[in-house]
Amino acid sequence: MSRAARTLRIGIDARKVNDYGIGSYIRNLIEAIARRPEASHYLFRVYVPGADRGALPELPPHFEIVEEDSPGYSIAELTRFAWRLLRDRLDLFHATHYVIPPLARARAVVTIHDIIHVLYPQFLPNRLALLYARVMIRRALRRADRIITVSYNSKRDLVDYFGIGPSRIEVIYNGVAARFRADLPRAERDRVAEKYGLPRPYLLFLGGEKPHKNVRNVLRAFAEARRARALPHALVLAGPMPKNRSRVEALIAALDLSARVVRPGVVPEEDLPGLFAGADAFLYPTLYEGFGLPVAEAMACGVPVLTSSTSALQEIAGGYAYLVDPMDVDAIARGIVDLATDPARRAEFADLGKRRAADFSWDRAAEQTLRVYAEALRGAPSRPAAPDPRPE
């Protein structure tokens, strides 16, 4: 049977569906694709670890969940997963991270969210991890029929670092789920605060302890802001916590913040709107982001955002949030004081942020992604690169 005479098969790599960050992209994109009427023209095979099947919502009949337990960054994904893709006779494979297993004969679309691994190799655990990242990203960029990235900043990074032709790269912004746009009743904010033992008022940081998340400068700036104005606020540090937390815990103690810092760990998505909405401000002065989804989600919740004037954060939040140099502790502290003590400034940035968040839609991202699939399946030539709407 010819390819034209049967329903085309599209595979989506969802093995990182429960990962922090990229998991949100995978879950929301698949759910939004499933809602699109044009998706019913295809059969989808969604590859998910057996333990994570419940992370995806119930999908329509043209979606099949396939258990695939080969971990990322492993020999298994280059062998066992590769053989599975070959046997499944896919017409197109969407690599939602940056690994396109060898042997796969299907056309390929790859999403490269950012290239932090190669721009900041000091953030990787060892040189082997750096080598793997470089090799697999380069291979994916050569192999892919279409390349998706999530910001114009990431597109520029790909062009500058790897020499990729701009016309091969499609920028598709992440979306913001509907749960973040709802006006939450006070009772929901109170429920979340009680569940996690959050004192009021509080400032929120979300992101864990990876070096590029810049949590140490956030703590230093918070301590400086408290010294300057005796702020009544607590600082909530939400996100994954490593087994060995001694360095950050030692810094918290050295800054005399033990009584003012709350660490709830990973907060599930259903509680995030209440966590955001209960904060006086959201602090996200990270060193590098490919998009910065928590910034868009906080904006949608009507929370004023303090974030970085670097990487994609300038593109996503510039003009709509309080921007700072993430390496300047004094600047972060001044921003904290400004937002914590000035209700008018908070209201201004809350309104601006809500307007900006309206630009980010998972339904639009799904529509654009399906268009990329169709072009890749047709073998259509790359369209001229869209102009970057943000200045360099």
Regions from the PLM with identified roles:
Residues 1-392:
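Carbohydrate transferase catalytic cores enriched for Leloir-type hexosyltransferases
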